[in-house]
């Protein structure tokens, strides 16, 4: 099956075909992002499709809720695929995991109505960006957090973050190569939380632009370090120019932690993740 490229899942399932949704978590450190790449370049999508194809004994193609970049992680990714093959839900979880590398795991499986779509049915997405704030770099959390040796003032970061809440043109926070049709997005919350030596940016919105969370993290860390005034976040936002936005933060600390769907789909909600933040309270809203 190495030479078979699975077909992409359709917009809606055909007659006689089941639409299956899966919850996925992965450590993105050794992958060139979610999306399937050219032969020989590791991606999360390729590894998952290969494992699912072994369980189904035929090619399987998946669609995800949000494509993550190289070295970005997920504890709450959602995908769907269509298949005429009948397998118990346990097989889609346990059987697929048996064929996946240790840094990718299927967490749940559900049979979905034909109109469910992992990407287009989503109402909101939530990310966490974990910053290890200490003079000494963390060996055990290498590639799982972003290390910032400068003392960060979380109070300044919190105050600056509030200007990002609501509906705005986020052009200043999008990557130059971003292909989104509109830079206007709605952020439901932008919070800074403390967990030991970790500062966690917790951000929930209807949709995100390419590199948007990492660019926001870069601006907030610059303000937290005292290198820019609190008002700089507002200035960057209003500039609507990526050149005003400063540095893009490293990918290692970024996690897609939850994708939210209408209640009719009754999808499970696990812990937000990542695992080392299990003691951090979930703030709803």
Swiss-Prot record:
It catalyses: uridine(38/39/40) in tRNA = pseudouridine(38/39/40) in tRNA. The keyword tRNA processing applies. The active site is at 69 (nucleophile). Keywords: Isomerase, tRNA processing. Substrate binds at residue 127. It comes from the Bacteria. Its EC number is 5.4.99.12. Belongs to the tRNA pseudouridine synthase TruA family. Formation of pseudouridine at positions 38, 39 and 40 in the anticodon stem and loop of transfer RNAs. This is tRNA pseudouridine synthase A. The gene is truA.
């Amino acid at each position: 099956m190495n030479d078979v490229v699975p077909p992409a899942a359709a917009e809606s399932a055909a007659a006689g075909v089941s639409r299956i949704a899966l919850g996925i978590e992965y450590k993105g450190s050794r992958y060139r992002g979610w999306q399937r790449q050219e032969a020989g370049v590791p991606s999360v999508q390729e590894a998952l499709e290969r494992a699912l194809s072994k369980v189904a004994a035929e090619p399987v193609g998946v669609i995800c809720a949000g494509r993550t970049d190289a070295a970005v992680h997920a504890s709450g990714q959602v995908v769907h695929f269509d298949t005429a093959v009948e397998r118990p839900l346990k097989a889609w979880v346990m059987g697929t995991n048996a064929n996946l590398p240790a840094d990718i795991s299927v967490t749940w499986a559900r049979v979905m109505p034909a109109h469910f779509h992992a990407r287009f049915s989503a109402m909101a997405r939530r990310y966490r960006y974990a910053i290890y704030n200490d003079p000494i770099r963390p060996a055990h959390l290498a590639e799982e957090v972003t290390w910032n040796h400068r003392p960060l003032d979380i109070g300044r970061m919190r105050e600056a973050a509030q200007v990002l809440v609501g509906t705005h043109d986020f052009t200043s926070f999008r990557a130059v190569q971003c292909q989104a049709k509109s830079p206007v997005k709605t952020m439901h919350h932008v919070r800074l939380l403390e967990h030991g030596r970790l500062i966690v940016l917790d951000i929930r919105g209807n949709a995100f632009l390419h590199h948007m969370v990492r660019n926001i993290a870069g601006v907030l860390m610059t303000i937290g370090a005292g290198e820019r005034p609190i008002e700089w976040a507002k200035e960057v936002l209003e500039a609507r120019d990526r050149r005003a936005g400063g540095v893009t933060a490293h990918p290692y600390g970024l996690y897609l932690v939850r994708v939210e769907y209408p209640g009719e789909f009754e999808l499970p909600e696990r812990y937000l993740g990542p695992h080392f933040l299990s003691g951090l309270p979930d703030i709803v809203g």
